[in-house]
Amino acid sequence: MIVVTGAAGFIGSCILARLNEIGRKDVLIVDHLNNELKPKNLKNKKFIDYFDKKDFLAHVESGQLSTDVECIIHMGACSSTILTDEKYYNENNFEYTKTLAQWALKNNVRFIYASSAATYGDGANG
């Protein structure tokens, strides 16, 4: 089984589509469906189950996530360049990523993490 976090976002849904194209439907998707576009991104995609991000994180932290996971593709982060809530960024981007990476390392599961240009800013400072 493959886990894709942020699966209903633009890039995550493209990853899910590609996994489907190569025959992978054993995908557990994770996201927070907080706007009308995200469910549309999942239309016609194949996956075995959906977890809300908070529920998924609770599963990971409590040791309930199946060890049948072969890979976590982690796209679940806030990439907004205008949001200024430091606590939210820390919990959603840093702590969430750290928890998943530690679980993957402990369970010998491949962990793929991708970032965006939002990490680096608009280039005004070099």
Task: Give the ranges of each region predicted by the language model.
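Conserved Rossmann-fold NAD(P)-dependent oxidoreductase catalytic core, especially the SDR/UDP-sugar
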Residues: 71-74, 99-126
